[in-house]
Amino acid sequence: MRGACKFLAGLPALPDKRAGKRGQNNKPMRIYLVVMDETQEAQTALRFASVRARETGGSVHILALVPRQSFNAFGGVQATIEREALERAEVMANAAAGNIFAESGRMPVIAVRPGSPQEVIRKYLEDHGDIAALVLGAAANGSPGPLVTHFAQHAGSLPCPVYVIPGSLTNPQVDAIAARGV
């Protein structure tokens, strides 16, 4: 058995398929995926991810979701409603990205995707194997929200950890937690 260990020790390491891009000190860049909407808890999650990315030499991906409309209007009206929802999501994601850039000097990756939120997020994680963590914000009061509930229940089947950031935290509290790591 010792000979086998010695033999294996002499082999070059296989490349890590999840290693992805390299950041500071040639370490794998940690990418934090934040699902953005117009809620305060999403803003809190984004703040956590941007501070954490700054501290780790990583980056942020912003995923803005455009849920399918639950009603069907006449063809042209339906297309207009869907286009307006897409434009609102793009404006919101770009505004959030601008805030991150203003604070950190690093521009996050922005993606706007239509569809079922859970399916879109799972597909994004599948397509971006270098995501280090999915960062979601929980509502300060009441239910944590459908995405937090869903992904907390299915955390064991995800390719990365899920960070749930309490919506009741103040900005200084979020900054302190993100700066020291979790």
Feature annotation, model-predicted:
Residues 2-18, 126-182:
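Gly/Ser-rich helix-loop-strand patches that form or flank binding pockets
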Residues 27-76, 157-160, 166, 181:
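Small/aliphatic-rich secondary-structure junction motif
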Residues 45, 72-75, 122-123, 145-147, ...:
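Short, well-ordered secondary-structure micro-motifs
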Residues 50, 98, 123, 152:
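Active-site phosphate/pyrophosphate- and oxyanion-stabilizing loops and adjacent acidic/basic residues
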Residues 52, 120-127:
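CheY-like receiver
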Residues 64-91, 172-182:
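Acidic, proline/glycine-rich short linear motifs
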Residues 102-109:
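A short helix-to-beta-strand connector/capping loop
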Residues 112-120:
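Charged docking surfaces used in two-component/phosphorelay signaling
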